[in-house]
Amino acid sequence: MHAAMQRGAPDPSEIIFKALLAASSATSDKLAEGNKASPKTKPPYRLLTVAYAANPSDITMPERPDGTRQVALDFVALVYDREGYLFTQQSNTVNVFAKPAAIDQFLKEGVRYQQRIAVPAKGEYYLRVGIHDMIGDKVGAIEIPVASIATTPEQSKSQPAK
């Protein structure tokens, strides 16, 4: 997984997925919850939301004696500058033992997960996102220039959402 997540590395395609990306138009002095930052990283930040949608047929789901299936995935988002220096990172591991009904739903709807990661508001950065199937040791990853990610308007606190 480490080599697959390096800035500029070829995109591994053992797990095919889509990533819906949205950047907050507002800035924040705080990292997104769970983010780790290098000492070089300074606020303000723009928060990005990453919504993963992966093909379930690419995920290893061994059946257990009790009829459940184990799914163990690591969702990783890394922010690099153009020289490849790592600024912020977010990694979330999901390890579940799913009953047959849940697996049926999983197969119909796909693998879905959402993360937030902070990106320094000024400068040229690249977001590399990936999924690691920890049971099958398969990886999928893509890299996106942060400047190409659309911003979403913030909801006004005084205006109700429509």
Residue ranges, per PLM feature:
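Scaffold/interface architecture of coatomer-like assemblies
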Residues: M1-K162
